[in-house]
Amino acid sequence: MKLLEGKIALITGASKGIGRKIAEKFAEHGADVAFTYLSSVEKGEALEQELQSFGTKVKGYRSDASKFDEAEKLIEDILADFGTLDIVVNNAGITKDGLLMRMSEENWDDVLNINLKSVFNVTKAASKVMIKNRKGSFINMSSVVGVQGNAGQANYAASKAGIIGFSKSIAKELGSRNIRSNVVAPGFIRTEMTDVLDPKVVEGWAQAIPLKRAGETDDVANLCVFLGSDMSGYITGQVIPVDGGML
C-alpha cells in the first residue's frame, strides 16, 4: 500500500543521513519528490538518479534554506516543475558543538540560521501554496536535545527547541485551513556521522536507551511517511520522539 501516492513533497537537506532516507521512503510510497542539498553536490545528484528508479517524479535543487530569498525561489521553482506542494519536511540542519564559554558568536549564529531560520523561511514560502489549496502537512525535524538540552550543544538545543515552539504556533495559525504542523524528535540514530565513532562509545550510549539499541534512519522516515499521509489527518501540533524511550 502506497501511502503518499499523488502527493508532492519537499525535503530539505536530503543528500545524506535521515533526510536521504526520508526522500527514499517518500518515493517508495508514491510521492513525487523535490529535495534540496547545498554542500554535498555529488550526493545530491546521485540521490536524484537513485530515486527515479521508484517511478515517481524527482528533482533536486541546490538551495540554501537559511536565506529567505533562496527559500522563496525554491518554492517558485517547485511550483513551476511540479505544479503544487502538499508536504514539506524541514530537515536541513548542522551541528557546531562546544561548551558555552568556548562557543563563538559565529558558531551560535550559523546553527540558529541553518537549523531554525531555515524552517521559518521555507514554511512561510510554502504556506502560501497550502493556504490556497486548503491542505498541507509540515513535518519539522527537531531532536530529543531540543526537549531536554545537552551540555556542549547549547546552540543546537536552542535551535531544536525553537522548532518545537514555532511548529506548535503554526499548527494553531493554519489549522483552520486544514494545514497540519508536527515535529519529529529523533534520539540516537545511526547515520554516517555515528559510523565513524568508537564502537564502544556507541554501545555505551545504546545501553542507556530502554530499547538497548540505536535507532535507524528508517525509524524516522517511517514516521514522516505517516505524518505526510492522510492517515494522520487529525494529528497536528505534536512532538513525536523517535528515541527508543530516551525521553
Range-by-range predicted roles:
Residues 8, 15-17:
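Conserved glycine-rich cofactor-binding loop
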Residues 99-100, 107-112, 205:
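Substrate-binding pocket helix/loop in short-chain dehydrogenase/reductase
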Residues 123, 159, 167:
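Active-site helix of classical SDR
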Residues 143:
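Residue(s) in the substrate-gating loop at a strand-loop-helix junction
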Residues 179, 213-242:
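C-terminal substrate-recognition "lid" of short-chain dehydrogenase/reductases
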